[in-house]
Amino acid sequence: MPRWLSAPEHARHRTVAASAGAPWTPRRVAMIAVHTSPLEIPGCGDAGGLNVYVAQIARRLASRGIDVDVFTRATRRDLPPQQRLAPGVTVRNVVAGPLEPLPKDELPVHLCAFTAAVLRAEAMREPGWYDVIHSHYWLSGEVGRVASQRWGVPLVHTMHTLAKVKNAALAEGDVPEPGRRVIGEADVVAAADRLVTNTWTEARQLVDLYGAEPDRIRVVPPGVETAIFRPGDSARARRRLGLPIDGCVVLFVGRLQPLKGPDIAVRAAAEFLSTHPGMRSTFRLVIVGGPSGSRSTEPERLRALAADLGVADAVIFAPPMPPDRLVEFYRAATVTIVPSHSESFGLVALESQACGTPVVAARVGGLTTAVRDGESGLLVDGHDPARYAGAIGRLLDPGLRAELVRGAVAHAMRFHWDNTVEGILGVYRDALAERRTAATQRLASRVG
């Protein structure tokens, strides 16, 4: 293990909360989320964990007296130029390209227009309006690095996913991330004052795959909204959702795209029923989510797969849900399945555990942090549906499930958005202090 990734080194130098007393607290932050708005419901199109992350961080920064503007691309004609996400948080809908959803691979050609609009918005303010830029995903990082140079303020960037990591773990039917993205990510890595990762695994990937400087990386785990996602009455939730009161309910939540492995969930359901035929009438696989991208045919493919496998009657499809409705699905589930081929963290796994529902997940990426194997859920090596079916079967043991339920809640409680935002604030302060120290040194050298 590289020295900078060792646990003692982390405790000594990389704990961002340690800088919480630093004087360089920003007044205003420009957040950039080009391809998806924090106002969208996760689970459909390009809306997912990134939306949740941006919304939660922005709200909590504002609650600490920091104004936040979130710049995102307008995708509908009826969208106003500005929308209020929360007190102190303004979502600015930037016109860049057609006013409709576009696949992410079509967005790079509109980045110049987007960047120009962001720069114009700042130009109408007094000089030095924004203190920090925080960009999310590589497309936003491309905008952020130009704005950072123009405004002379630090760029903090969160990748959320990495092209090289995704390309190394492609699902069947998926397409590789384009070379343009790989180049763009490398440019952002080189330009950012600080790179925020969800886990140490992601930090290593930035160093090993992109040549990132370790001293500029900060690990800040995301959180879970425990005011919403908390344990509740499972039987009541099942009655509300029309699910069997006594039986096995497997839940999948997420965008319906090969990367997330919804087909593995369907195949695992078929495997489970082949070994537990007596549970046919009380087993349900509930898939909550929508297509990823406006041209996706994944929902139809999954329905056809369920029919081909003879389990169409046991598979229920539901559209993306807002948090206050999604929590009912988590509470109703026996287990949540997360068979992703690549995952930078896995907020779905954390939300499920916070509700007291154990998780069966792939042993990949950030899921190895989001789930404690054998304590809050079960991690599965590879993507063989039979292995997932076997893990689901293990949770039929009342003793094991009760143990995992307790462990799931305890593990989720370690992750809170308030801790995350304190970590992010530490990163901002760190970057601001470094910039201002460098400016002071440059001035002193000229005077000397």
Curated annotation (Swiss-Prot):
Enzyme Commission designation: 2.4.1.250
Family: Belongs to the glycosyltransferase group 1 family. MshA subfamily.
Binding site for 1D-myo-inositol 3-phosphate: 35, 46-51, 104, 137, 161, 181
Alphabetized PANTHER family for the sequence: D-INOSITOL 3-PHOSPHATE GLYCOSYLTRANSFERASE (PTHR12526:SF510), GLYCOSYLTRANSFERASE (PTHR12526)
Organism whose genome encodes this protein: Acidothermus cellulolyticus (strain ATCC 43068 / DSM 8971 / 11B)
Xref: InterPro entries: Glyco_trans_1, Glyco_trans_4-like_N, Mycothiol_biosynthesis_MshA
Functional summary from the UniProt entry: Catalyzes the transfer of a N-acetyl-glucosamine moiety to 1D-myo-inositol 3-phosphate to produce 1D-myo-inositol 2-acetamido-2-deoxy-glucopyranoside 3-phosphate in the mycothiol biosynthesis pathway.
Lineage: Bacteria, Bacillati, Actinomycetota, Actinomycetes, Acidothermales
Reactions it catalyzes: 1D-myo-inositol 3-phosphate + UDP-N-acetyl-alpha-D-glucosamine = 1D-myo-inositol 2-acetamido-2-deoxy-alpha-D-glucopyranoside 3-phosphate + UDP + H(+)
Protein name, entry field: D-inositol 3-phosphate glycosyltransferase
Superkingdom as given in the UniProt entry: Bacteria
Keywords: Glycosyltransferase, Magnesium, Metal-binding, Transferase
Keyword Cytoplasm on entry: no
Xref: HAMAP family: MshA
